[in-house]
């Protein structure tokens, strides 16, 4: 029976590996005095170079599934006092400390204040000394509606801000009118009279500018 012919480059089923003859392999031209190193000599088939030998401390067990360059060296053995038995959960040489319990932050109790006083404390009410109060009360007897410039001067004299003086006079007027209801009616009448007078003066000024005559009521 004639054996089937094998052609290089066309593998057949159940065919042995094809080995190329030596004279088929390309060799570059060399001078007659050139000597090829023994590691580069071409044989009838390509040989896989062997990996270099590792030192004794780094030798590893061969693993057929992991290449030699992927294997990690084993860690050095621990001293006798630090070795742990596989059956014991904790080595007697180690001392395990329990976790410290969580402690809630200490919150200092606030003074118990109820009613309107609690609201005033929450808003940050300004507290005046007796000297400051006497200065403000003296000015309040002269004028219950100080101007912006007067409030600034009072603020400098009692060492507070201008808006604090404005709030103090607002609260002081409310308390004064609550204690003297008849004064509130007078204040409203004066405000209405002042508005009417200012309107009449404005009309007189406009009439004088245009040359018309305006009769005062």
Curated annotation (Swiss-Prot):
UniProt superkingdom: Eukaryota
Keywords linked to the UniProt accession: Developmental protein, DNA-binding, Homeobox, Nucleus, Transcription, Transcription regulation
DNA-binding region (UniProt annotation): 121-180
One GO cellular component, as annotated: nucleus
InterPro entries registered for this protein in UniProt: EMX-VAX-Noto_Homeobox_TFs, HD, Homeodomain-like_sf
Tissue: Specifically expressed in early embryos.
Keyword Transcription recorded: yes
Pfam families: Homeodomain
Region of interest (Disordered), ranges: 190-217
Keyword Hydrolase: no
Compartments it resides in: Nucleus
GO terms assigned for molecular function: DNA binding
Main location: nucleus
Similarity remark: Belongs to the paired homeobox family. Obox subfamily.
Purpose of the protein: Transcription factor required for zygotic genome activation (ZGA), a critical event in early embryonic development during which the developmental control passes from maternally provided mRNAs to the expression of the zygotic genome after fertilization.
Name the record gives this protein: Oocyte-specific homeobox protein 8
Gene designation per UniProt: Obox8
């Amino acid at each position: 029976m004639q054996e089937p012919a094998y052609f290089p480059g066309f593998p057949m089923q159940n065919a042995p590996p094809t080995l190329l003859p030596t004279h088929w392999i390309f060799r570059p031209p060399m001078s007659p005095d050139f000597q090829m190193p023994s590691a580069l000599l071409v044989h009838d088939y390509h040989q896989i170079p062997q990996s270099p030998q590792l030192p004794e401390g780094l030798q590893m067990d061969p693993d057929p599934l992991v290449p030699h360059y992927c294997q990690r060296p084993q860690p050095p053995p621990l001293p006798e006092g630090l070795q742990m038995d596989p059956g014991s959960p904790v080595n007697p040489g180690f001392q395990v400390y329990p976790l410290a319990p969580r402690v809630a932050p200490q919150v200092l109790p606030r003074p118990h204040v109820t009613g309107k006083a609690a609201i005033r404390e929450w808003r940050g009410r300004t507290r005046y000394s007796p000297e400051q109060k006497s200065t403000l009360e003296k000015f309040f007897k002269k004028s219950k509606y100080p101007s912006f410039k007067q409030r600034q001067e009072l603020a400098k004299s009692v060492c507070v801000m201008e808006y604090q003086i404005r709030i103090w006079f607002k609260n002081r007027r409310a308390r004064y009118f609550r204690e003297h209801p008849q004064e509130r009616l007078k204040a409203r009448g004066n405000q209405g009279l002042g508005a009417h007078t200012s309107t009449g003066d404005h009309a007189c000024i406009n009439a004088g500018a245009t040359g018309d005559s305006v009769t005062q009521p």
